[in-house]
Structures are given as structure tokens and as C-alpha cells.
Amino acid sequence: VRCIAAVRADTDIVQGYKIGRGDPWHRKVIGRVYHHVVKLLFRLRVRDTDCDFRLIRRTLLEKVSLRSNTGVICVEMMCSFQRAGARFVQVGVSHYARPHGKSQFFRLPAIWRSGVQLLQLWWRLMVRRDIGPANP
């Protein structure tokens, strides 16, 4: 409801960020480190790139072309939107612990793979400045 209430005529994307994160301490630490690294490497002004609560104007989606097909797509998307001049509004969203199961991400091989993918994305977007062509 907060995301919908934040939509205005001058807003291209309403981006959520987690509040009251209901995770174990080690996930909070890893998540915080990840977000600081992402903000530093990609110069992002978004508070939480991986919060999946977002409303995006179709016209903004039509301006960018995303190529990632892994977990770094959220970083590519936010970086591409920011470069396209998108106007962001950020809204806090409640975050709850998983009632069942475990995340597959918080294992060393997955963390390593994500780190490598993040560096590859950094090289493509920040060094080569290759954000891809706009969609036709």
C-alpha cells in the first residue's frame, strides 16, 4: 500500500527498502556488506537494490535493455535506471523471516559466484560503460 501511495506523476520508479529485517544476524551482516559494496562500486543512490518491491513505469522499462540473467540483474536494473535519468521514490517495506526452508544463497559457493558476477557486471557497466542499447 505504501508503494502505491508513493506513485506520483513525477515518479518513474517506486523502490522498496527492507525495514525491520527479520533475518538471522549473519544474513544481516552479509546483506549490509553487500549493499555497501554495491553502492560503492556502482555509485548507486538506491538504498536497497535487492528489495523486490518496486513499481516501474513502462516508459522507463522501454528505455533500458537488461542482459543479466542471474542475481545481479537487480544491480544492473538500478544502474541502468539511474543512468537513464529515472526519478526514484524509496519506500520502507516490512521484511519477515522465512516461515519454512533455508536460502540457498548464503553458502560459500553461491556467495563466491555472486561476487564474481558482480565484478563482471562492474567491469561491463562502470569500466566499459556498456549499458546496452535501448529497447526498440
Indicate residue ranges for each PLM-predicted region.
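C-terminal, non-catalytic tails of nucleotide-sugar-dependent glycosyltransferases
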Residues: 117-136
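A ubiquitous, low-specificity "background" feature that marks scattered single residues
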Residues: 54-56, 82, 123, 136
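Catalytic donor-sugar/metal-binding loop of nucleotide-sugar-dependent glycosyltransferases
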Residues: 44-45, 66-69, 78-96
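Acceptor/aglycone-binding surface of glycosyltransferases and processive sugar-polymer synthases
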Residues: 1-71, 98-115, 132-134
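Secondary-structure boundary/capping motif
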Residues: 57-60, 86-87, 121
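Short, hydrophobic alpha-helical packing/hinge segments within bilobed ligand-binding/sensory domains
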Residues: 52, 77-78
